[in-house]
């Protein structure tokens, strides 16, 4: 039997006569090779299309984890920008449901419990609804700037990416200039579903923030490390870093 590489490079090795196409019986080796080729090409094309879509603000605010995924075969939800049944990262469409970019108080007071208002709740449910809301998405500069390596980042990496947000939806009525000043907010460092939310970083809450950070690391299966005040190079990032570690959205994607 010819090797797969030989089949791909030399169709003549199949010993098939193409004089009468109707009489040709395609060998299973060719069908298998063709299937693998088409599958790889389709996957590459879908990945490129997803990457292009995620670079668009409109897509991120109104389609990311909102539009139902149309793929029939099994795939990695964490690498797919579309919504799947039972996925914790799913969002309500802000164009169809009138909710604001403010966190739902029931999600904060009742960890793990469903909001009694359900899908009609006027507040954001979860990290993705909160930070991808048009009143918040990219209205804050990312601390890492162009060096950011997050696959999904809710913040602006250049001045050109900064958005003013919608005045009717935003409680802060931000302008692009004001976002570069002292107004800093960041996503919660803890997993949103099942844990309390942390909306800002405050030095007086350092102990509580460190506890949340340690929990987030345990949720991701990372090794628990106790910070040492005498350590020259801390293992964990300081809790006063407003942009926070990239744990919350990851845990939500894989739930």
From Swiss-Prot:
Pfam families per UniProt: zf-CCCH, zf-CCCH_AtC3H23
Keywords recorded for this protein, A-Z: DNA-binding, Metal-binding, Repeat, Zinc, Zinc-finger
Record bears the keyword Zinc-finger: yes
Alphabetical list of InterPro entries matching this protein: Unkempt-like, Znf_CCCH
Domain of life the protein comes from: Eukaryota
Disulfide bridges in this chain: none
C3H1-type zinc finger span: 98-128, 137-159
One GO MF term attached to the UniProt entry: DNA binding
Keyword Zinc assigned: yes
Protein name: Zinc finger CCCH domain-containing protein 37
Organism encoding this protein: Oryza sativa subsp. japonica
The organism's taxonomic lineage, starting at the top: Eukaryota, Viridiplantae, Streptophyta, Embryophyta, Tracheophyta
């Amino acid at each position: 039997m010819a090797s797969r590489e030989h089949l791909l490079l030399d169709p003549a090795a199949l010993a098939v006569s193409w004089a009468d196409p109707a009489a040709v019986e395609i060998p299973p080796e060719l069908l298998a090779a063709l299937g693998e080729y088409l599958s790889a090409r389709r996957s590459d094309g879908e990945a490129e299309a997803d990457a292009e879509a995620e670079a668009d603000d409109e897509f991120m605010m109104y389609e990311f984890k909102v539009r139902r995924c149309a793929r029939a075969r099994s795939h990695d939800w964490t690498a797919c920008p579309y919504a799947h049944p039972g996925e914790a990262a799913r969002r309500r469409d802000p164009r169809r449901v009138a909710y604001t970019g403010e966190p739902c108080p029931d999600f904060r007071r009742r960890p793990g419990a469903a909001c009694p208002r359900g899908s009609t709740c006027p507040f954001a449910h979860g990290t993705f609804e909160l930070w991808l809301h048009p009143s918040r998405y990219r209205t804050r500069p990312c601390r890492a700037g162009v060096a950011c390596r997050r696959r999904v980042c809710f913040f602006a990496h250049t001045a050109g990416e900064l958005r003013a947000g919608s005045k009717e939806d935003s409680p802060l009525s931000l302008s692009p200039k004001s976002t570069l000043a002292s107004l800093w907010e960041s996503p919660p460092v803890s997993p949103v579903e099942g844990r309390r939310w942390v909306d800002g970083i405050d030095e007086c809450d350092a102990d509580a923030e460190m506890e949340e950070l340690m929990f987030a690391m345990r949720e991701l299966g990372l090794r628990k490390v106790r910070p040492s005040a005498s350590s020259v190079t801390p293992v964990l990032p300081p809790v006063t870093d407003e942009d926070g570690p990239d744990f919350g959205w990851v845990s939500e994607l894989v739930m």
